[in-house]
Amino acid sequence: MKSVILFRHGKSDWNASYGGDHDRPLNSRGIKAAKKMGLFLSTKNQIPDIVISSTATRAKTTAQLAMESANWTSKFMLESGIYGGSPNYLLELIHTQKDKYDSLCLVGHEPNFSSFISIATGQDYINFTTANMAKINFEVD
């Protein structure tokens, strides 16, 4: 059994001065939520083996704050393709890690996370709000 946690970045600051969407930072609410979700996973004993984050500032900061808030020892890496990546891209990314890790956390964006969750679980489209998480367990051979 392998598990994937999809973690949408915290609330971002639309009023901040930044170079483009990729560089948009978290706002104070997003910072607080990222830390809270990191602690939540820790209290549930669900700390992933690896965290793979989008390179977008708001996602990368979310991942780092979650990890720091509860002293996760997870491996951390950035993956530019998560930003704007299709559900198929996310599946391929997960597939490349299946022999290395039992659990992983992807930190990224909408609408690709909602689409991926819907496809992976066979459910209708879901609304995946900021700083939200979904865990999916996969049977692998």
Task: Give residue ranges: language-model regions.
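Active-site-proximal alpha-helix that buttresses catalytic centers in soluble enzyme cores
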Residues: 2-3, 7-81, 85, 113, ...
